[in-house]
């Protein structure tokens, strides 16, 4: 069994927080990109589209690696049932809280913004269910996926731990070439599964819950397990934290391929399958790029960084409806895309931080948006003198 590191992994905490916060410029730039979203500017911006594609190509892949790393660390700290309970509470409670408080009002707002409120009663029962699945889960999808992954990893992590007890992990060697081949095969395997589903029963791919619970989990699970393995094997972790020109160059070429597929691919052909293969290896190489960069520049303790590490989940949860509100009611009055983008950042981040500070002063909200019980200090229990 692995000992839990005594020293805090500051750079991983920081990377995870900044990847979460990157969701803000990602969604604001989506308004000004050429991609169709709930709300869009009158004219798309080429550079903001490129910026949006860059963030989207790797952000959640690296995020799930870090999630797997910390998840296995906690797996060794707690008994199995307590580990599952703690992990599910910390992601499940904020998700269930955000649905009635954030994504439901967001859905109602969009119904009127997009002029769909009047047609809602005419939808079939299934269409209403599926629309609500997509719209209420919305940007919370990764929390649902983490709940599913945690449940699956009750068995997977047990198998990994049992195998480690019967093998010598010090002799386990990894190389980026071998990992690249493995992830290329995983990408091809995922593409085959998706294409098979598309041929056999294509409507299921547009089902929101199937997409989140099955397809997204299936795609991101290898990165989650990779994070756990990086915690177990120091050599693998060192492979990611050591700068590699080869990974940087390969990631750049893969991103170009990603853009070409976005530009010339067709959803009715092989665009989504090709994207899964490209992003699977791109995500692996970007783990090295991001980890090595973060290890060099972010591996320190800072009160300011700690503040945003603690605030990142709450800010991410509330930013999405704020972004859509900005896009629906403020964007049409700003003619410059770049000015609108900057104003959007100030608007969303500013209000999100204010809401974060307010929620810290309300114990119930603090618990609901973190999933962590409020611990009273001993001196709070002491009688006044």
Curated annotation (Swiss-Prot):
Transmembrane spans: 17-37, 60-80, 91-111, 137-157, 173-193, 212-232, 239-259, 274-294, 311-331, 338-358
Annotated InterPro entries: Acyl_transf_3_dom, Glucan_succinyl_AcylTrfase, Glucans_biosynth_C
Record GO terms (molecular function): acyltransferase activity, transferring groups other than amino-acyl groups; transferase activity, transferring one-carbon groups
Disulfide partners: none
Family that this chain belongs to: Belongs to the acyltransferase 3 family. OpgC subfamily.
Functional summary from the UniProt entry: Necessary for the succinyl substitution of periplasmic glucans. Could catalyze the transfer of succinyl residues from the cytoplasmic side of the membrane to the nascent glucan backbones on the periplasmic side of the membrane.
Protein name according to UniProt: Glucans biosynthesis protein C
Organism name: Shigella boydii serotype 18 (strain CDC 3083-94 / BS512)
């Amino acid at each position: 069994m692995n000992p839990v590191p005594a020293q805090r992994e500051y750079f991983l905490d920081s990377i995870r927080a900044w990847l979460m916060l990157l969701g803000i410029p990602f969604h604001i730039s989506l308004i000004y990109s050429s991609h169709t979203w709930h709300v869009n500017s009158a004219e798309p911006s080429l550079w903001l589209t490129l910026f949006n594609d860059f963030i989207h190509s790797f952000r959640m892949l690296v995020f799930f690696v870090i999630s797997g790393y910390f998840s296995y660390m906690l797996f060794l700290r707690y008994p199995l049932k307590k580990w599952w309970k703690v992990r599910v509470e910390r992601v499940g409670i904020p998700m269930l809280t955000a649905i009635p408080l954030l994504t439901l009002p967001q859905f109602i707002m969009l119904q009127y913004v997009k002029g769909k409120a009047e047609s809602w009663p005419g939808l079939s029962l299934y269409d209403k269910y599926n629309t609500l699945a997509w719209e209420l889960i919305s940007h919370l999808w990764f929390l649902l996926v983490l709940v599913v992954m945690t449940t699956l990893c009750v068995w997977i992590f047990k198998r990994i731990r049992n195998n480690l007890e019967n093998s010598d992990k010090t002799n386990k060697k990894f190389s980026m070439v071998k990992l690249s081949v493995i992830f290329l095969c995983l990408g091809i395997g995922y593409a085959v599964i998706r294409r098979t589903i598309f041929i056999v029963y294509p409507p299921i791919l547009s089902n929101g819950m199937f997409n989140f619970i099955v397809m997204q989990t299936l795609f991101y699970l290898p990165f989650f397990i990779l994070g756990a393995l990086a915690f177990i094997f120091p050599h693998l972790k060192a492979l990611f934290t050591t700068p590699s020109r080869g990974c940087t160059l390969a990631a750049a070429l893969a991103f170009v391929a990603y853009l070409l597929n976005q530009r010339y691919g067709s959803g009715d052909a092989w665009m989504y399958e090709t994207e899964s293969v490209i992003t699977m290896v791109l995500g692996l190489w970007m783990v090295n790029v991001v980890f090595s960069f973060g290890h060099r520049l972010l591996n320190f303790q800072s009160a300011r960084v700690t503040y945003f590490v603690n605030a990142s989940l709450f800010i991410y949860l509330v930013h999405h409806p704020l972004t859509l509100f900005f896009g629906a009611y403020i964007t049409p009055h700003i003619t410059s895309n770049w000015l609108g983008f900057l104003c959007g950042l100030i608007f969303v981040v500013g209000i999100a931080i204010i809401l974060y500070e307010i929620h810290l002063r309300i114990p119930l909200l603090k618990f609901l948006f973190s999933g962590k019980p409020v611990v009273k200090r001993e001196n709070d229990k002491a009688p006044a003198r």
